[in-house]
Amino acid sequence: MSPRDYWYAAGHYSASEHGGTHIDAPIHFSRGGLTVDQIPLAKLIAPTVVIDISEACNKNRDYRLSVDDLTTWEKQHGQIPDGSLVLARTGWGKYWPDKGHYLGSDVPGDINVLHFPGFSLEAARFLVTRRKIIGVGIDTASMDYGPSRLFEVHGIILGAGLYGLENIAHLDSLPPTAATIVALPMRIKGGSGAPTRIIAVLP
């Protein structure tokens, strides 16, 4: 190369707000809720609670995290602390990127054949009414389980002004407590969600 030559690389990027590892802002299922750019940064840095339901999910791919799962965790580790981010470890990350296993089907657009774990309606209500959390997360495509058609968990969590993180990778590397999550969503003005880089800080 001559002194006047240089290397230059550039690309074009586009994506859904709700594809890959991403955040669901309250407005996604709550009219008038916060958009992704309005979520305070302080809410995106949080101590985590990791509820391991992978054994149950291996037996039932439509398993939903229950109130019993939450109270069993609390018997071992104490009450879920205020300001926590509650993460459901289903073990589903091991199936990525095989859509047939991860989603239950590799047929594009056919929501009638989706099968993967999620949060139960009762657990979502418990977390919103009985605990003071800032959000939930899961290593599947949705906080609602695959066969859901009404997305009631979304309605409860986001309707309470909380946020959700979906398609989280490597949850199997986090302990039940003591980790801090730093969620870094793309700051899309007016966005209902955004691709998100998630960093875990361990003690």
Where are these regions (language model features)?
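Active-/binding-site microenvironments in catalytic and ligand-binding cores
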Residues: 1-203
